Amino acid sequence: MFKNERDGIIMEWEKLNVDDFSNAIDESKGVILIPIGCLEKHGSHMPIGTDILIAREIAIRASRIENVMVFPFIPFGIVGEVKHKLGTISLTSNLIYNMLDELCDEVARNGFNKIVFVDGHGGNHNFLKYFIYFTSFL
């Protein structure tokens, strides 16, 4: 298993080689966290990526408590009131739904049977409830 001296076992998808990845699936018992947020204006006092940075950090800290895999963050979410502001990326809900649907299929194909979204953006709440209710995988 890939380790570093400070944090112990690394369970971050993108940092593992193929052999470590296979072991991580077993270690995680098939559980994966997918951080999701959005890129949006938060004023001049906070980064545009605040939502995804928070969601990613929560997922990484959780993986240090429980052996669960962490997927690279998804920087796209449902943006309403600031969708036309500088730095904001606003995609359609259909595109995000289809992306998440295919992503869940691919994550399952790779050996994960329990997918947990770690949401850092309030605008995603109802959308994710809808997605989880209607998706064929979850």
Place the predicted regions along the sequence by residue:
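Short catalytic helix/loop segments, enriched in acidic residues and glycine
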Residues: 51-63
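Short, acidic/small-residue loops that bind anionic groups at enzyme active sites
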Residues: 61, 65, 137-138
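Active-site histidine-anchored catalytic micro-motif
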Residues: 9-16, 78-138
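Short glycine-enriched loops at secondary-structure junctions
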Residues: 68, 74-77
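A generic structural signal for alpha->beta connector loops
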Residues: 30, 67-68
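Active-site and ligand/interface coordination hotspots across diverse enzymes
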Residues: 2-47
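Glycine-rich loop at the start of a catalytic domain that most often binds anionic cofactors/ligands
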Residues: 45-52, 83-87
